[in-house]
Amino acid sequence: HIVASEVGRIVENAGAQALTIHGRTKDQGYRGEADWDLIAQVAEERTIPVIGNGNIREASDVIRIQQETPCSGLMIGRAALGYPWIFRDIKHILEHGVAPEPPSIEQRWETIIEYTRRIMARPFREERHKDLCWMRPKFIALTKGMEGSRKIRGALGTVVQIEDLEVVAEQHCKQYSESS
């Protein structure tokens, strides 16, 4: 039983200033497609801003959703974890009407390494966070879709220190760089 409209009414009547809807059921979890028709329905029914979330994987999804729904805003979730450049792409497509060129392999690695440096500069309470082993799944997500990314997964699985990551990046760039 889908209760989004009812919950939207209750939330608004309780004084909420905005409402975010993830367009999937609990049983769906992260599987399947978000129900943007349902999100649009709730947005039409409510006077508070409704922020839609689900299946926003690339910049063109934002344009489509803006055209198809009365949502006041959108929320990006897992797509940003694997492709943080989505925000750059969205800004570009909103300003210019077309998606930008994807970041080069070098640009992606620069971002990944800078992100890793910033994460590792933070104080950690747990000893298990002192090396990069716990970030290996994040590296795989961040390199997904890059040319040759499947071939470097094994190397990413051995990364312990930032220097290891830099070696993987350098070798990957050398092999697949657009400038070579």
Summary of predicted features, one role per range:
Residues 3-18, 30, 37, 41-52, ...:
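Alpha/beta catalytic cores of nucleotide-metabolism and tRNA/nucleoside-modifying enzymes
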Residues 20-24:
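Short beta-strands and strand-loop turn motifs
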